[in-house]
From Swiss-Prot:
Name of the protein in its database record: DNA ligase
Gene Ontology process terms (BP): cell division; DNA biosynthetic process; DNA recombination; double-strand break repair; lagging strand elongation
Expression induction or repression: Expressed in the early phase of the viral replicative cycle.
Main subcellular location: host cell
Cited Pfam families: DNA_ligase_A_C (PF04679), DNA_ligase_A_M (PF01068), DNA_ligase_A_N (PF04675)
Outcome of substituting D194N: In strain: Bangladesh-1975
Catalytic reaction equation(s): ATP + (deoxyribonucleotide)n-3'-hydroxyl + 5'-phospho-(deoxyribonucleotide)m = (deoxyribonucleotide)n+m + AMP + diphosphate
Residues annotated for Mg(2+) 2 binding in this entry: E377
Sequence positions that bind ATP: E229, R236, E283, K382, K397
PROSITE patterns (alphabetical): DNA_LIGASE_A1 (PS00697), DNA_LIGASE_A2 (PS00333), DNA_LIGASE_A3 (PS50160)
Amino acid sequence: MTSLREFRKLCCAIYHASGYKEKSKLIRDFITDRDDKYLIIKLLLPGLDDRIYNMNDKQIIKIYSIIFKQSQKDMLQDLGYGYIGDTISTFFKENTEIRPRNKSILTLEDVDSFLTTLSSITKESHQIKLLTDIASVCTCNDLKCVVMLIDKDLKIKAGPRYVLNAISPHAYDVFRKSNNLKEIIENESKQNLDSISVSVMTPINPMLAESCDSVNKAFKKFPSGMFAEVKYDGERVQVHKNNNEFAFFSRNMKPVLSYKVDYLKEYIPKAFKKATSIVLDSEIVLVDEHNVQLPFGSLGIHKKKEYKNSNMCLFVFDCLYFDGFDMTDIPLYKRRSFLKDVMVEIPNRIVFSELTNISNESQLTDVLDDALTRKLEGLVLKDINGVYEPGKRRWLKIKRDYLNEGSMADSADLVVLGAYYGKGAKGGIMAVFLMGCYDDESGKWKTVTKCSGHDDNTLRVLQDQLTMVKINKDPKKIPEWLVVNKIYIPDFVVEDPKQSQIWEISGAEFTSSKSHTANGISIRFPRFTRIREDKTWKESTHLNDLVNLTKS
């Protein structure tokens, strides 16, 4: 059984390793011949763990300030300079209530059992007792690691591809499809991995689209022809049905709020009368009585009440699994034909996505013009012979900004990193916001642009919604996670960028700026489009995504 100390040493070695091959080799060498291989891999990838601990950084600080009898204010201030694990370790070392162990005694099994128990409790008094118990058997470094596991970020600069391909060169691609870590560990040989497929009731990493700024580029990507599908302004939903059991997953593979999808349990059996088990890729949109789409955000429970004659409607665009058969390796035109055979539309409830078979540039231009005239979001272009590749950006998207001369072909989903005081009538409140993106390579957040222009009501709401730490443009108070040049040091920084809001930002064009730290990429005339409540920081535009957007 692997000890926590061994696991910590592995994490440290991975962090300091220089590249993908070296990191994967370290993991491969470590797990070879170990009986708890699955547990090691699972804990190396805490972000994939579906256990929910009901605790953010601020709550962890609050609880450990009580346990250690330390100043919560001092602990929060320390957190502003680094990471939660470092803060807890520092104050654990200084506290006089619980003496840290001199020698590590915990196994990974002990830690995993603790995390399972933590995920089952929600009362603060119970959390205090459990976190006290674990601290009493930890060294300072042990507790730091445990807290980082609770925070679901080990800071080892190694994501799923690095870790899973240590098992087998094909493991990461198989995981994208099956999303079943345990099955991959148990079938690690290539022959066995090839037998793993989509399974009903387990979410599949959704296939994605990259931006495209010209019709000509689309035909270079799909020379044999393409489908042009309406880009729906709703929420991506993956539907799973197994007999009378249903599951609905969002684009980040989390359960969808029940009020948005409960009605589907009545209509899916009617639309798919022959299906015992099925997995669908689709978009849920609020439509009026004429089946006209209502704006993004109208799916919210309060917003929906504003549209009295509206319905939730599922626009189905793909079938990934049907009665025991994995459909993902079948060409799209065959999947679509099969879908037409097995699905019966229910008006305003379950309908086919709007799809056009495109054979020339003139036809694509006409379809795009029509979509934009109807004030639709744009088009998604798909290879007619394409297989479904989970997690891969093999499709193309052309959004409404494409036709505006000199404008960005696509927006960027950036994270609010900080804020500045406004001027004049907006003096004394946060009115200008620092937007940025995550750099997977460095593990830091980089700045892209400043954004303003919100109306008074929106600004009033944002003062309460955004959790900020006031630093008064002091360079010494810039948190370790933020890379910002002196000219853009804000009055406030967010307490935790991973809990911050994600805003869709569009503008005239991507531009270069020596003052911004995201590889010098910025946005000319940035404008706020909407809050992306359907995304977490993981689905926001990362630095490598931003680089690709500027290239396209």
